Design a protein with these regions (language model features):
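Hydrophobic targeting segments
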Residues: 1-6, 21-22, 28-33
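Short, well-formed alpha-helical segments that are part of the catalytic scaffolds
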Residues: 11-25
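A short acidic, amphipathic alpha-helical/loop segment
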Residues: 17-21, 45, 101-105
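Residue-level recognition of beta-strand->loop/alpha-helix junctions
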Residues: 33, 59-61, 118-121
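Active-site-proximal specificity loops/subdomain of glycosyltransferases
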Residues: 38-90, 97
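Conserved donor-nucleotide/metal-binding helix-loop-beta segment in metal-dependent transferases, i.e.
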Residues: 98-126
Length: 133
């Protein structure tokens, strides 16, 4: 199985687009909402976005703002729920593009004994919101 995990916080501008980007290429999506207070408006925003896409919020966590160590812990805790599955780890402003279907990449990895795939970050969103070649 292929799962997506994202930890979203103070800005939900790209979240709907990001979740839509991955929705058809993963089996399950885990959205962790990182809040600075229990009254943080982000929870309402994320709830509306995920509801529109028929995705459940996996977890909410109230933490000090911008604690990147804690964000990493939240990613890792979530991945431990299904330790034998493949995971796409993506912030809400990251849209991974692969050279071939992700299932084929995973098959190649499993055949060759690889446990993970890394890649480079490249900002390539065009004026119309598409990914130019």
């Amino acid at each position: 199985m292929i799962n997506l995990v994202t930890v979203c916080g103070h800005n939900t501008t790209m979240l709907k687009h990001m979740l839509s980007h991955y929705k058809d290429i993963v089996d399950d999506i885990f959205v962790v909402v990182y809040l600075s207070t229990d009254k943080d408006k982000v929870l309402f925003e994320v709830t509306e976005i995920t509801k529109d896409l028929n995705i459940d919020i996996h977890k909410t966590s109230i933490e000090e703002p911008f604690n990147w160590t804690r964000v990493t812990e939240l990613y890792n805790e979530t991945k431990l729920l299904k330790p034998d599955d493949w995971w796409i780890v993506s912030d809400d402003d990251e849209f991974h593009v692969y050279p071939k279907p992700i299932n084929e990449l995973i098959e190649d990895c499993e055949e060759n004994g690889y446990k993970f795939i890394t890649g480079a970050f490249l900002d390539r969103i065009g004026k119309d919101g598409r990914f130019p070649k």
